[in-house]
């Protein structure tokens, strides 16, 4: 829904510049026409781009370049998405905000009244979602004695991203000569849609895409999951690398799988290997300690008890000689 100012010019209507400024017809020839066209090009290119991670908060800037002070009783501020028309938030004098706001932005977008008095009409957007990848338009109008004049318009393109999980690689089928080996790589909960590559680590070359089958789909969170299946002829040695690329974050996440493993999850994880070793070592040490303790108890019980008679013997010998 596109909001309209009652009894004034609607948001989608632009009053001609020559009517607002009362410019004579001679202005549209020569230098005057050139300057007008130049100003139109500059206005059309006034677009900024902002990046945000899913679940984070972001500020979409809309600031008066002159940083003038404003009386809120004469201001009308609108933040909306143009195509399709979606009302994000707005400020109307003496009106309760949020009544006509789209349900997906209720309690997520707000304006600061104190900041608006200083010429800062920025949108504070909470809990960013993938669906917020949009162009947001800020329009500020000031009420004069006769009309509502637009004093500021900004377009902000929001690009949303989310990190993909570390790829998990598994292999199946026999690793015997003459048979085919199948690799599967899976990564979840990223945004936007990723690129996935398989790399031969022997020479760091990209593996032919004809040998792989990639499937990308949106999950219930609105994020992307990707799964890829790669089929290669058997080789005695030849590790492969699965690489998931997030273009928005300029990020590559990789995992390596060894060809000599037969089945199961072959993604190398040093921490997991260390934990498995500890799980085996601790019980063995406990058994050895218990066996040593039992042996010590048995030894103490079976050792013969002898009396110490040395001094008595010496005393007896002295008595006989006497």
Swiss-Prot record:
GO terms for cellular component: external side of plasma membrane; membrane; plasma membrane. Residues 1-43 form the signal peptide. Residues 47-277 are extracellular. Residues 299-322 are cytoplasmic. Disulfide bonds join 62-138, 185-243. Induction: Up-regulated by TNF and LPS in nonlymphoid tissues. Residues 167-263 form the Ig-like C2-type domain. Its main location: membrane. It comes from the Eukaryota. The keyword Transmembrane helix applies. Keywords: Adaptive immunity, B-cell activation, Cell membrane, Disulfide bond, Glycoprotein, Immunity, Immunoglobulin domain, Membrane, Signal, Transmembrane, Transmembrane helix. Gene3D superfamilies: Immunoglobulins. Expressed in lymphoid tissues, primarily in B-cell areas. In the lymph nodes, strongly expressed in the cortex and in both primary and secondary follicles. In other lymphoid tissues, primarily found in the marginal zone of the spleen, the follicles in the Peyer's patches and the medulla of the thymus. Detected on resting splenic T-cells (at protein level). Also expressed in nonlymphoid tissues, such as lung and thymus, as well as, at very low levels, in kidney, liver, peritoneum and testis. One of its GO terms (molecular function) is signaling receptor binding. It is a single-pass type I membrane protein. Residues 49-149 form the Ig-like V-type domain. It is found in: Cell membrane. SUPFAM superfamilies: Immunoglobulin. The chain crosses the membrane at residues 278-298. GO terms for biological process: isotype switching; positive regulation of activated T cell proliferation; positive regulation of interleukin-4 production; signal transduction; T cell activation. Ligand for the T-cell-specific cell surface receptor ICOS. Acts as a costimulatory signal for T-cell proliferation and cytokine secretion; also induces B-cell proliferation and differentiation into plasma cells. Could play an important role in mediating local tissue responses to inflammatory conditions, as well as in modulating the secondary immune response by co-stimulating memory T-cell function. During pregnancy, may function to skew the cytokine of maternal T-cells toward immunoprotective Th2 phenotype. Belongs to the immunoglobulin superfamily. BTN/MOG family. Interacts with CTLA4 (in vitro). The interaction with CTLA4 is not observed in different experimental settings. This is ICOS ligand. The lineage of its organism: Eukaryota, Metazoa, Chordata, Craniata, Vertebrata.
């Amino acid at each position: 829904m596109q909001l309209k100012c009652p009894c004034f010019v609607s948001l989608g209507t632009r009053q001609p510049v020559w009517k607002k400024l009362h410019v004579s017809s001679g202005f549209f020839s020569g230098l005057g026409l050139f300057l007008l066209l130049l100003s139109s090009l500059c206005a059309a290119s006034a677009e900024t781009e902002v990046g945000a991670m899913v679940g984070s908060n972001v500020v979409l800037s809309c600031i008066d370049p002159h940083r003038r002070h404003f009386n809120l009783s004469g201001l009308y501020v609108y933040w909306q998405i143009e195509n399709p028309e979606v009302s994000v938030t707005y400020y109307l004098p003496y009106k309760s905000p949020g009544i006509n706001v789209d349900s997906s932005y209720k309690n997520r977008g707000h304006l600061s009244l104190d900041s608006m008095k200083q010429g800062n009409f920025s949108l504070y957007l909470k809990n960013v979602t993938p669906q917020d990848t949009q162009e947001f338009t800020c329009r500020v109008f000031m009420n004069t004695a006769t009309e509502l004049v637009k004093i500021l318009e900004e377009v902000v393109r929001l690009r949303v991203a989310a990190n993909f999980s570390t790829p998990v690689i598994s292999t199946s089928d026999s690793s015997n000569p003459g048979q085919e080996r199948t690799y599967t790589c899976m990564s979840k909960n990223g945004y936007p849609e990723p690129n996935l590559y398989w790399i031969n680590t022997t020479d760091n070359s990209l593996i032919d895409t004809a040998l792989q089958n990639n499937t990308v789909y949106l999950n219930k969170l609105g994020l992307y999951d990707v799964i890829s299946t790669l089929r290669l002829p058997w080789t005695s040695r030849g590790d492969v690398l699965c690489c998931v690329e997030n273009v928005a974050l300029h990020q590559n996440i990789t995992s390596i799988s060894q060809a000599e493993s037969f089945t199961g999850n072959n993604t190398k994880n040093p921490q997991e290997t260390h934990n498995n070793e500890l799980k085996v070592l601790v019980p063995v040490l406990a058994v050895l300690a218990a066996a040593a303790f039992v042996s010590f108890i048995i030894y103490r019980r079976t050792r013969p008890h002898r009396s110490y008679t040395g001094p008595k013997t010496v005393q007896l010998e002295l008595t006989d000689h006497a």
